[in-house]
């Protein structure tokens, strides 16, 4: 579905968990993936998975609150072609994080965002 957007892309995997989404993007040709999760345990798992898959050189991992990580990316003037958001279920972080990404100017002009959300919540359609 998003294969064309992945190749050579700068990817953000926010609320990365075990890193599976970002690692999949790297395996399909993404140039670089920035992983963020606030859980130290998740960050350890992501680091292990990157080592196992051989994608360490194409990855950057931060372990911080999502808003802090996004602010740090803005200071570095990063732009993302593909944003993967898989937040904790029913916490409202889906909308908040996507709005913050837009407000901070982190999305490239043709950015694609893929966001996991509650099936009953269709409000993201309007962002």
What are these model-derived regions, one by one?
Residues 1-125:
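Class I S-adenosyl-L-methionine-dependent methyltransferase catalytic core
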